[in-house]
A protein has these predicted regions:
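Non-catalytic signal-transmission and effector/linker regions of two-component phosphorelay proteins
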Residues: 1-15, 122-168
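Short amphipathic alpha-helix used as the core "switch/output" element in two-component signaling
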Residues: 53, 75-86
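Alpha4 helix (beta4-alpha4-beta5 surface) of REC/receiver domains from two-component response regulators
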Residues: 76, 97-126, 130
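Active-site beta3 strand of CheY-like receiver
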Residues: 58-64
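Acidic catalytic/metal-coordinating carboxylates
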Residues: 47-50, 72-76
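Conserved acidic segment of CheY-like receiver
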Residues: 12-25, 29-33
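Receiver (REC) domain active-site loop signature in two-component systems and cognate sites
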Residues: 69
């Protein structure tokens, strides 16, 4: 047996679904996310309805949703996705990160509403990193020691001026 192979540790690659009607933004987010070898975009959608269909088919760990999309907005898509993927961590990454949007997102399964403005990409990467770290801990722990697989709740995320926590 190859010693290098025997000591190799399986690393779970975080599967991320990205839904935004702006193709240039999707391309930028994809490039930034895939710089991390632990993460990969498993699918992209330009509208909410396609996001729901892809989530059902691809079973992502993280779903990034824009608020304003054709056919179905991000909050409506999150309600549907959460009904069949309760363990997926969902984030609303939007230019509309207002208190009104946070109120609409309440109870949808969305863990955070992040603004695209300012350091939006850094906040998004921080969210994914936190989910990735917690997911990796669940996959690498012995079966009796694995952490809960609940979705992120509002107490899991720090809130800043451009990161609004939501309550369930």
């Amino acid at each position: 047996m190859d010693v290098a192979r025997a000591t190799e540790v399986h690393v779970h690659r975080m599967r991320i679904l990205l839904a935004d009607d702006n193709a240039a933004l999707r391309q930028t987010v994809r490039q930034i996310i895939e710089e991390n070898p632990r993460w990969r975009i498993c699918g992209e959608a330009a509208d909410g309805r396609t996001a729901v269909e892809l989530a059902r088919r691809l079973n992502p760990d993280v779903v990034i949703l824009d608020y304003k999309m054709p056919l179905m907005n991000g909050v409506e898509a999150a309600h549907l996705i959460g009904s069949f993927l309760p363990r997926a961590s969902m984030v609303l990454f939007t230019g509309e990160a207002t208190k009104a949007v946070v109120e609409q997102a309440r109870g949808s399964g969305i863990a955070a509403v992040l603004s695209k403005a300012g350091n939006g990409y850094l906040r998004l990467l921080s969210f994914i990193d936190r989910v990735s770290t917690e997911t990796q801990g669940r996959h690498s722990a012995p079966p009796g020691k694995r952490k809960s697989t609940k979705r992120h709740g509002p107490s899991d995320l720090g809130a800043g001026p451009r990161c609004l926590r939501i309550s369930r």
